[in-house]
């Protein structure tokens, strides 16, 4: 049996561009791809922290050091410039590998530059938690 496990995650990246008319994918700064051990064409889930949207696509490399996180194609209807997102890649592995595997968790600053790289999936990097996202259903009183 294979288990599907978290392989890598880029946590709380800021979307820098959204291009509805591009053919698809997400453009990611090559430095972030390297830090997260993501390959061009690799499948990722994108979770939008601002609005709760979740989608799947594949990555294409962006200019190294640019901080680019570009949402391309139809996904630009769901994820917008300035939104905070989490990019997640999963891997399939056998039971023994899954029990020993350490994911790559990349924390970035507001300019999408790496500030922490570890395997801890439960702790935010210092100073990155930010203000809570407002609940649109909450009573404004």
Swiss-Prot record:
Organism of origin: Salinispora arenicola (strain CNS-205)
CDD domains tied to this protein: Asp_decarbox (cd06919)
Residues annotated with Pyruvic acid (Ser) modification: 25
Disulphide-bridged cysteine pairs: none
Pathway: Cofactor biosynthesis; (R)-pantothenate biosynthesis; beta-alanine from L-aspartate: step 1/1
Post-translational modification: Is synthesized initially as an inactive proenzyme, which is activated by self-cleavage at a specific serine bond to produce a beta-subunit with a hydroxyl group at its C-terminus and an alpha-subunit with a pyruvoyl group at its N-terminus.
Organismal lineage: Bacteria, Bacillati, Actinomycetota, Actinomycetes, Micromonosporales
Protein name in UniProt: Aspartate 1-decarboxylase
InterPro entries: Asp_de-COase-like_dom_sf (IPR009010), Asp_decarbox (IPR003190)
UniProt: substrate binding residues: 57, 73-75
Catalysis performed (reactions): L-aspartate + H(+) = beta-alanine + CO2
Annotated localization: Cytoplasm
Pfam families: Asp_decarbox
């Amino acid at each position: 049996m294979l288990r599907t496990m978290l392989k890598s995650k880029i946590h709380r990246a800021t979307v820098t561009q959204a291009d509805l008319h591009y053919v698809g994918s997400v453009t990611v700064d090559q430095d972030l791809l390297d830090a997260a051990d993501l390959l061009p064409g690799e499948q990722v889930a994108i979770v939008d922290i601002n609005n709760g949207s979740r989608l799947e696509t594949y990555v294409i490399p962006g200019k190294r050091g640019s901080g680019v996180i570009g949402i391309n194609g139809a996904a630009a209807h769901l994820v917008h410039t300035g939104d905070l997102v989490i990019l997640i890649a999963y891997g399939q592995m056998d039971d023994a590998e899954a029990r020993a595997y350490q994911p790559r968790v990349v924390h970035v600053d507001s300019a999408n530059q790496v500030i922490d790289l570890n395997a801890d999936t439960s702790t935010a990097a210092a100073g990155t938690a930010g203000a809570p996202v407002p609940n649109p259903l909450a009573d404004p009183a």
